[in-house]
C-alpha cells in the first residue's frame, strides 16, 4: 500500500496494473479487480485491464492464463497526477513498459514415400511410375530442447 497522497495513488495504480499484466491471467485479474475496484466501479468485464489481458491471451492463442513459455515483464515508465479533488480523490495515470516473450516450438510428424532409384552414384527419386500411397499424417506436439534430433543434409 502506498501513501495517502496523489503520488501514492499513481504508485498504487502502477502496482495494480503490473500485478495483473505480469500474470496475464483472467482468474488473477478477477482477484485483483475484486480487491482493488470499489463497488460501482467498472465491472470485471468492462475493466480495461480485463480487456487488455483477454486481448493478449487471444492474440497469443493461449487459454485463461499465459502458458509457462510466455514471459511478461512490466516496469513503470512514467506517472501523472492529472487531477485532484480534495485529499481523497485523484485522477492518476501511469505509463508502463511492457515486454512479452512468447517462445513456442512445435514438432510435427511428417511422412513421405517416394520410389527411389539408384543412378550408379546415388539414390534419387525415380521419374517413372505413379507416386506411392502416402502414410497417414501424425499429430502435432510441442518440441522441447531435448527432443530435437540432428538431421543429415540431402
Give the location of each predicted region.
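Surface-exposed, charged secondary-structure patches
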Residues: 59-100
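Hydrophobic/aromatic beta-strand elements that line small-molecule binding cavities or substrate pockets
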Residues: 78-81, 111-117
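Soluble periplasmic/extracytoplasmic beta-strand elements of cell-envelope proteins
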Residues: 12, 91-93, 124
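Short, cysteine-centered beta-strand-loop-beta hairpins and adjacent loop/turn segments enriched
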Residues: 98-109
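Short coil-to-beta-strand transition motifs
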Residues: 71-73, 108-111
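Low-complexity, intrinsically disordered terminal/linker segments enriched in charged
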Residues: 103, 125-154
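Core segments of small alpha/beta cavity-forming domains
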Residues: 1-60
